[in-house]
């Protein structure tokens, strides 16, 4: 990727939404609910505190995260639809080991 976010901004690749309902009905693209989870692609260096010291971010590239429904700004970078948001808009990090245990 040729994009580096500034300050406490984070670049997110939104997770793919469900294409079928639980009852087996195929959901068209314009009726799909946008997923509120995604993967962190890139992070900025961090924000500055009152003293001017750099405060690093809690998330890192590769983290699976949960964010608010209206969080972030949709952008297209290198032909890919991504989100850019501040770290404060991220609600939490999803533990991949727990997800893997559920799938097994």
From Swiss-Prot:
Localization, UniProt: Cytoplasm
Pfam families hit by this protein: Cpn10 (PF00166)
Keyword hit for Cytoplasm: yes
Top-level division of the source organism's lineage: Bacteria
Single GO term (MF): protein folding chaperone
Gene Ontology CC terms: cytoplasm
Coiled coil: none
UniProt keyword Chloroplast, yes or no: no
Entries under InterPro entries matching the protein: Chaperonin_GroES (IPR020818), Chaperonin_GroES_sf (IPR037124), Chaprnonin_Cpn10_CS (IPR018369), GroES-like_sf (IPR011032)
GO terms (BP aspect): chaperone cofactor-dependent protein refolding
Keywords, ordered alphabetically: Chaperone, Cytoplasm
SUPFAM superfamilies: GroES-like (SSF50129)
Primary localisation category: cytoplasm
Quaternary structure, from the entry: Heptamer of 7 subunits arranged in a ring. Interacts with the chaperonin GroEL.
Described function: Together with the chaperonin GroEL, plays an essential role in assisting protein folding. The GroEL-GroES system forms a nano-cage that allows encapsulation of the non-native substrate proteins and provides a physical environment optimized to promote and accelerate protein folding. GroES binds to the apical surface of the GroEL ring, thereby capping the opening of the GroEL channel.
Family to which the UniProt record says this protein belongs: Belongs to the GroES chaperonin family.
Name of the molecule in the record: Co-chaperonin GroES 1
Source organism (scientific name): Mesorhizobium japonicum (strain LMG 29417 / CECT 9101 / MAFF 303099) (Mesorhizobium loti (strain MAFF 303099))
Origin organism lineage: Bacteria, Pseudomonadati, Pseudomonadota, Alphaproteobacteria, Hyphomicrobiales
């Amino acid at each position: 990727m040729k994009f580096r976010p500034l300050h406490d901004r984070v670049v997110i690749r939104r997770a793919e939404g469900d294409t079928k309902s639980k009852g087996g009905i195929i959901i068209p693209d314009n009726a799909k609910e946008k997923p509120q989870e995604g993967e962190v692609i890139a992070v900025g260096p961090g924000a500055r505190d009152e003293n001017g010291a750099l405060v690093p971010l809690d998330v890192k590239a590769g983290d699976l995260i949960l964010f608010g429904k209206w969080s972030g700004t949709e952008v297209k970078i290198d032909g890919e639809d991504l989100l850019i948001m501040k770290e404060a808009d991220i609600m939490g990090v999803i533990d991949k080991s727990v997800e893997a245990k559920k799938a097994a």
